[in-house]
Every structure is written in C-alpha cells, then in structure tokens.
Amino acid sequence: MITAASLLTALAVFIARLCDVCLGTIRHVMIIRGRRLLAFSVAFFEAVIWVYAVSRVIGAVSDPVTSLAFALGFASGTYAGITLEGVFKIGEQVVRVFTREGGPVACTLRDAGFRVTVFDGQGRDGVVNLLFVQVRRRQAGEVARIARNVDPECYMVVDDIRKTYTVGG
C-alpha cells in the first residue's frame, strides 16, 4: 500500500539520486579537465548523497515505488548532469579553421580579441591556411560564427584541451 510516508521517501530518494548522478557527471568532467581538487570535493558530496539514497532504498526494499524513484532519479540525474555541463561549458577548446581566406579571417578574429596562429598548408585543391584559436568553451561558437561570416566555405574542427603549458615569458 502506498502511503504519504512512502511517497515522501520515494521523493527524497529521487532527489538524492538526481543530485548524486548529476554531481557524478560534473566530477567526470573535472577529472577529464585535470581539476583534481574540484573532482575530489564533488566526489565527497556525491558519495554522501549516494549513501543516503541507497540506505533509504534498502530500508524500504519491499516498496516498489522507492525502487522506481531510485531508477528514475538515476536516469534524470544523467540527463540533468549532461545539461548542466553544457550550460557551464567548463574548460578550453582549440578551434582549427581551414580556409582559403586566412588573412581576412585571422584579422577579423584578432579584431574581436582572439589570439590566432596561422599556418600554411596544402589541401586537395591547393593552398589553404590553418588557423589555431584557443578559447574558453563558451567562446568557440563565437569564433565559428566570425569565421563563417568572413569565409562561408571554411571548415572547422573543435577539440577540447586538457592542459596547456606556457614556455618562456
């Protein structure tokens, strides 16, 4: 029989699982980005919440509503974690722009405040320029928009950066 107490327990389990799985997704991002201390801190809270959720499910093992809330919280936490990671856009990326209009694209990007390194290359149909632009993840879309405005035929590749090293002064 479903009671108000069992519904409250199920709701608490759902919220706990949503939070701990969401934190787990963020923790994985921090690990990939090399942010050890932040990953450590998130892992601590993730584990505390997980223990709470599991203890509630074990305490109500005969209640299918609580078990369903556990599973639904897991699925919802996965979705929420991915969504949050996309909103926060933590980290840096390198945008590589392949273009025949390297000079104008580089100048426009530099005028917008981006640092651009230009290389010459040989493509299938002749000489191309390869532009490297390192940006915060939230700026990658702006770089792509600027490059496309100058050269609608350009081709871009965007990669996540784990670490960067500065040499010299």
From Swiss-Prot:
The coiled-coil regions, if any, are none
Entry keyword set: Cell membrane, Membrane, Transmembrane, Transmembrane helix
**Organism domain of life:** Bacteria
| InterPro entries xref list | DUF2179 (IPR019264), DUF5698 (IPR044035), UPF0316 (IPR022930)
Which topology term describes how it sits in the membrane? Multi-pass membrane protein
Q: Which HAMAP family match?
A: UPF0316 (MF_01515)
- Species of origin reads Oleidesulfovibrio alaskensis (strain ATCC BAA-1058 / DSM 17464 / G20) (Desulfovibrio alaskensis)
Localisation per UniProt entry: Cell membrane
What is the protein named?
UPF0316 protein Dde_2502
Provide the Gene Ontology terms for cellular component.
plasma membrane
Q: What is its main location?
A: membrane
The entry's family comment says:
Belongs to the UPF0316 family.
Q: Where are the transmembrane segments?
A: 1-21, 38-58, 68-88
Q: What is the lineage of its organism?
A: Bacteria, Pseudomonadati, Thermodesulfobacteriota, Desulfovibrionia, Desulfovibrionales
What Pfam families does the database record attribute to this sequence?
Answer: DUF2179, DUF5698
